[in-house]
């Protein structure tokens, strides 16, 4: 999912609860969501076996693999995709909404965790007909 679309969905979902949020805060919330999600599962986009110079290791996983720290989203580039598996993009969106609600709207956290659990139960495989 494109980073700009993720930002727009977040702003739309939160439009009733908040007025406006600066992009730098949305980026910070997205990074926090990445860390939360990577603590619960192993996104295949971030799973590597060979380390490149510009990559920062987030944590080790099984079979000598590791997760890298994803890049911060760039909302200036309208073609850039969020650096996480497509099926986890809505987990990112919902976790950011949870953070933006200052932890008051736990429905967003519940949705985030359900998406992560679905991802884990499908062994990280993208489903052709999945509707999130």
Give the positions of each predicted feature.
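Conserved short "hinge" loops at termini or chain/domain junctions
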Residues: 1-81, 111-132
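Exposed beta-sheet edge/beta-hairpin loop segments within beta-rich domains
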Residues: 82-87
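Charged, low-complexity interaction regions
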Residues: 18, 100-106
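Short, hydrophobic/amphipathic alpha-helical patches that form generic packing surfaces
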Residues: 32-35, 90-102
């Amino acid at each position: 999912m494109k980073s700009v679309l993720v930002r727009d969905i977040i702003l739309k979902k939160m439009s009733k609860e908040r007025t406006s949020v600066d992009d730098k805060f949305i980026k910070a919330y997205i990074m926090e969501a990445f860390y939360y999600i990577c603590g619960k599962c192993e996104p295949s986009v971030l799973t590597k076996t060979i380390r490149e110079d510009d990559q920062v290791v987030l944590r080790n996983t099984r079979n000598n693999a590791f997760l890298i720290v994803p890049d911060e989203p760039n909302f200036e580039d309208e073609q850039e995709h969020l650096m996480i598996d497509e099926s986890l993009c809505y987990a990112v969106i919902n976790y950011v909404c949870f953070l933006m609600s200052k932890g008051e709207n736990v429905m967003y956290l519940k949705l985030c965790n359900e998406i992560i659990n679905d991802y884990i139960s499908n062994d990280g495989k993208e489903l052709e007909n999945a509707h999130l």
